[in-house]
Amino acid sequence: MLQDFPEKLRQRIQSLPDEPGVYQYFDSGGSILYVGKAKNLKKRVSSYFTKEHDTSRLRLLIKKIDEIKTIVVKSEADALLLENNLIKELQPRYKIGRAHV
């Protein structure tokens, strides 16, 4: 399924580190869509693009992703704190508070 996405996104996903951190998805207009945390950024972000999704809301999110930004942190706990702060600050369309897509 990863091959169905633009080369820019495939390259970005393949270059992600195997470290804890926070990832942010943006649409083509630069608006924030989603903020999430991961203990392994590469595995977590890749999972969105390599499996079938059971909700139409999640499928819609994935179709809108144009850019992926990440912030590497030292621990999963740091990722959780940063994720919560970024959600409050950026108010992404697909994740408010701890509620998932």
Language model region names:
Residues 1-98:
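Acidic, glycine-enriched active-site microenvironments
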